[in-house]
Amino acid sequence: MKRIYFISVVALALGLGAVRVTAERRAQEAKPDAKNEHAYSGMYTFLKEGEFVQVTVEDTGHVTGFVSRFGDGESDKGAFLDQFFKSGKLDGNQLSFTTDIVHGVSFDFKGTVERGDGKNPGDEAYFLLKGRLTESASDVNKKVSAHSQEVVFKMFPQDGAPAAVERK
């Protein structure tokens, strides 16, 4: 009888230990790995179908990249425009960037990098950019208007993304 009791106690202890290890592993997977910030580098969706933002994380937390989008103005309607980052920073999972002004429009993003629904690195939506995007536009009279919205940009799958373009 003591032997059965002992075996039951050992089995219960091992089972609880396995549950704890599994819970800890899931908690770690849910958080982006701040030690491997380069993993955040990649191409993410942007506001419209066919538009994207390329994010490249450097060693120091400095972020470079660009937004590729369709023009909305009368002179650039439907044209594909690239807006390089004027500044960009990653601190832990806090991401911010501001683009150059192109045809009177610039973008400012402040938010976080978070784990998405992708199961493995390289899967679609493995990482997400969540935050507030502010679009500033100036007209011919230099009057500036700003529109701000909450956004979620999903990382493209690694095999489906074209190679990154280096900024010169």
Regions found by a protein language model. Give the residues of each.
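Bacterial N-terminal signal peptides that target proteins for export
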Residues: M1-S8
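Bacterial N-terminal signal peptides
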Residues: S8-G17
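Sec/Tat signal peptide C-region and signal peptidase I cleavage site
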Residues: A18-T22
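Central antiparallel beta-sheet cores of small beta-barrel/beta-sandwich binding domains
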Residues: R26-K168
